[in-house]
């Protein structure tokens, strides 16, 4: 973990209220798939940092890409950043997808929902680099909300679901996965809790890893704002920012 200043290389709105922010900094060297950064807004009245998942990184160039949706004052503040600006960053944080301890799969299904799609990109890239056959299934509310389909096709097959049916399959990600003829060796998923519950229920026998989305205040496990009950004993809790955000599906009670 490192508190540092990162430099803005570029920022672009790539979908409705969704921004691609490219940053440069030394902390990129420590990044792994599934981790996140805590960004500090520039406005003095916004005291809390905001957690943003890491979409991708290039350790040689010392750059990373963050994708975020403008939903409140903090993310609105970030959207005003432009080339050459600096931003106060804490990270990289959290335990991401540890590909070294997972038996090498032949096939992997990566399921993302909304702003849970970004961390699937770097994960898919690294799995593909290992020779894994990657399938992405991304869910959005509407076509105007969708992003990164073209980028993901470089590393695997991409399927899109939209709730309103304006693009891809109408419905949810599970409306796509239920028609797959074979189950994958491993599943990785990030998105809203309802989606993660559906993914977990749809693949009870498949090794599944979930990246949880919870509101965070400190990002380092000190404030207990982002707890999640443990499976089998809901009186015990995980701190999502410190123990996760990635967990085995059988570890957590959603």
UniProtKB/Swiss-Prot annotation:
Keywords (A to Z) from UniProt: 2Fe-2S, Electron transport, FAD, Flavoprotein, Iron, Iron-sulfur, Metal-binding, Pyrimidine biosynthesis, Transport
InterPro entries on file: Cyt_c3_hydrogenase_gsu, Dihydroorotate_DH_ele_sf, Dihydroorotate_DH_Fe-S-bd, Dihydroorotate_DHASE_ETsu, FAD-bd_FR_type, FNR_nucleotide-bd, OxRdtase_FAD/NAD-bd, PyrK_electron_transfer
Free-text comment on the cofactor: Binds 1 [2Fe-2S] cluster per subunit. Binds 1 FAD per subunit.
Residues binding [2Fe-2S] cluster, per UniProt: 218, 223, 226, 241
Gene Ontology terms: biological process: 'de novo' UMP biosynthetic process
PROSITE patterns with a match to the protein in the record: FAD_FR
Pfam family name, one: NAD_binding_1
MF terms (GO), sorted A to Z: 2 iron, 2 sulfur cluster binding; electron transfer activity; flavin adenine dinucleotide binding; metal ion binding; oxidoreductase activity
Domain FAD-binding FR-type, chain residue ranges per copy: 1-99
Pathway listed: Pyrimidine metabolism; UMP biosynthesis via de novo pathway; orotate from (S)-dihydroorotate (NAD(+) route): step 1/1
Transmembrane segments: none
Cofactor (UniProt): [2Fe-2S] cluster; FAD
Ligand binding (FAD): 50-53, 67-69, 74-75
Function: Responsible for channeling the electrons from the oxidation of dihydroorotate from the FMN redox center in the PyrD type B subunit to the ultimate electron acceptor NAD(+).
Assembly and binders: Heterotetramer of 2 PyrK and 2 PyrD type B subunits.
PANTHER family linked: DIHYDROOROTATE DEHYDROGENASE B (NAD(+)), ELECTRON TRANSFER SUBUNIT, DIHYDROOROTATE DEHYDROGENASE B (NAD(+)), ELECTRON TRANSFER SUBUNIT-RELATED
Family according to the record: Belongs to the PyrK family.
Name of the protein: Dihydroorotate dehydrogenase B (NAD(+)), electron transfer subunit
Organism: Listeria innocua serovar 6a (strain ATCC BAA-680 / CLIP 11262)
Upper lineage: Bacteria, Bacillati, Bacillota, Bacilli, Bacillales
Gene: pyrK
């Amino acid at each position: 973990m490192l508190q540092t200043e990162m430099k803005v290389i570029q920022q672009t709105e790539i979908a409705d209220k969704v921004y691609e922010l490219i940053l440069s900094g030394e902390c990129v060297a420590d990044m792994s798939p599934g981790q996140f950064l805590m960004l500090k807004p520039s406005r003095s009245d916004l005291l809390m940092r905001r957690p943003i998942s890491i979409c991708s990184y290039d350790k040689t160039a010392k750059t990373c890409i963050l994708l975020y949706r403008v939903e409140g004052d903090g993310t609105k503040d970030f959207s005003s950043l432009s080339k050459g600006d600096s931003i106060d960053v804490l990270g990289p944080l959290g335990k991401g997808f540890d590909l070294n301890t997972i038996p090498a799969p032949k096939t992997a299904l990566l399921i993302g929902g909304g702003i849970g799609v970004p961390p699937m990109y770097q994960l898919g890239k690294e799995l593909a680099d290992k020779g894994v056959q990657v399938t992405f299934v991304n869910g959005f509310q509407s076509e105007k909300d969708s992003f990164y389909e073209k980028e993901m096709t470089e590393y695997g097959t991409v399927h899109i679901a939209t709730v309103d049916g304006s693009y891809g399959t109408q419905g949810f990600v599970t409306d796509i996965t239920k028609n797959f003829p074979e189950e994958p060796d491993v599943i990785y998923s990030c998105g809203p809790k309802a989606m993660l519950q559906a993914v977990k229920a749809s693949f009870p026998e498949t090794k599944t890893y979930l990246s949880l989305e919870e509101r965070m205040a400190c990002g380092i496990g000190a404030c207990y704002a982002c707890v999640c009950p443990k499976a089998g004993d809901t009186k015990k809790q995980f701190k999502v920012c410190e123990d996760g955000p990635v967990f085995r599906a059988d570890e957590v009670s959603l």
